[in-house]
Amino acid sequence: MCGQCLPLLLPKGKTMAHVAPASYSIPQKALHWLMALLILFNLIFSDAMEEVAEAYERGEVPSPDDLTFANIHAYVGIAVLCLGLVRLVIRFTRGAPPAPAEEPPVLAVAAKLAHGTFYALFFLIPLSGIGAYYFGNETAGFVHGGPLKSLMWLLIAVHILALLVHQFYWKTPVATRMTRG
């Protein structure tokens, strides 16, 4: 986002200094953990969606159980999409804590890139899933269950690894910003 556009998104009379809190707000923390649970649920329990797609490809009717679980997967994905939008609005209006002073600048840039990619995936994964499930778009289905899903798993692993490095190597209290801080 351009530096000239950002002031337009800030509350009236606020500057970036006012928007950079020391910790995430309770709504931000709640959204983070709720979305983490929903995303992990959908990443782990996607088999029924694949069964439904394969049944349709074979010209068969999917089992009622597979349809039920595929619908749950779809509804959870739509919830992630909606919560991602709320989370983005809160992030623009409230801001986020600054990177710890001890963090090397190159890793601070990498963290911003990773967080930006997370936000993109909060929208791209559900939208591609909607395209595949509700509109039968095979390309959307491939992108949804292939590269985007793999990228989400990779980002989750990097996110956890970065947290562990902050906590145990640099001894920075980054985890408390999203838990109790």
Regions found by a protein language model. Give the residues of each.
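Membrane-embedded alpha-helical bundles that constitute the cytochrome b-like, heme-associated redox core
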Residues: C2-G181
